[in-house]
Amino acid sequence: MSRAPDRIAACFDALRHSGRKALIPFITAGDPSLEATVPVMHALVRAGANIIELGVPFSDPMADGPTIQRSSERALGRGAGLAYVIEAVQEFRREDATTPVVLMGYLNPIEIHGTRRFAETAVAAGIDGVLLVDLPPEEADETRAIFTEVGLALIALASPTTGEARLDMLCSTAQGYLYYVSFSGVTGAADRLDTHAASDRLRQLRARAGAPVVAGFGIKDAASAAAMAVDADGVVVGSALVAALADASDVRSARERAEDFLQPLRQALDAG
């Protein structure tokens, strides 16, 4: 089959040339409703998103805090499994052929699907990358090889506790972008970001990595996004956005909440 277009690289190239930072919102597919996922994705792009991370609902999301755990449970209760997520991206691509979409999730659903079959199906649907939070880099060679063959980026995670040997491996094999978790813990758990420590690490990573470096975990609003973006190529916002969408009463409300939440972050990043 033909390789996927490299939308992630094109996105970061365009941002670099315009002196802007990537804004990467995370939402759980299927929450606040099955019908809202694609309209919310389009709303986020209108509000200034450059890349969308779409969470694949999973029954045991060990890296996620209570906000995303509850979101995942609600989505699973509506039947939002891997097949639904792939179909949602297919629908999104009917109107948006350029915004990169990255799936974030766990290894088990992909292994059940079959890694090669999943990779081919994902690329055909218009998915650009996958971040598997429970796939150790030391065990990722086979998955990366399959993904690389079809043009699907295997996005890697680094954290403040990542050892130097593993960090060397992550930097040398980084695809799409390297996701730096700005503190140790589960998503949504940080009350206060240590931006100074994170900035030092981000500068080191950007000097070493063969891909852009984005920061996430603990970014809740425009101020924290702007602070973290100074030494990163972009920022990811997840739990705070998921919480803002959680009790949207209908698709229109979900769209409006998505735009209202993201626009101040876009403005703050562009002002910086």
UniProtKB/Swiss-Prot annotation:
- In short, the EC number is 4.2.1.20
Question: What are the alphabetically sorted keywords of the record?
Answer: Amino-acid biosynthesis, Aromatic amino acid biosynthesis, Lyase, Tryptophan biosynthesis
Q: Where is the secretion signal located?
A: none
Which pathway, metabolic or otherwise, does it act in?
Amino-acid biosynthesis; L-tryptophan biosynthesis; L-tryptophan from chorismate: step 5/5
Q: What class of enzyme is it?
A: lyase
The record ties this protein, via InterPro entries, to: Aldolase_TIM (IPR013785), RibuloseP-bd_barrel (IPR011060), Trp_synthase_alpha_AS (IPR018204), Trp_synthase_suA (IPR002028)
Q: Where is the active site?
A: E53, D64
| Cited Pfam families | Trp_syntA
The reply to whether Lipoprotein figures as a keyword in the UniProt entry is no
Q: Which reaction does it catalyse?
A: (1S,2R)-1-C-(indol-3-yl)glycerol 3-phosphate + L-serine = D-glyceraldehyde 3-phosphate + L-tryptophan + H2O
Its cellular-component GO annotations read:
cytosol
Gene Ontology MF term list: tryptophan synthase activity
Could you confirm whether the keyword Amino-acid biosynthesis appears in this record? yes
| Family, similarity comment | Belongs to the TrpA family.
| Role according to the record | The alpha subunit is responsible for the aldol cleavage of indoleglycerol phosphate to indole and glyceraldehyde 3-phosphate.
Quaternary arrangement and interactors, per the entry?
Tetramer of two alpha and two beta chains.
Protein name per UniProt = Tryptophan synthase alpha chain
Please tell me the species this chain comes from.
Xanthomonas campestris pv. campestris (strain B100)
Primary gene name: trpA
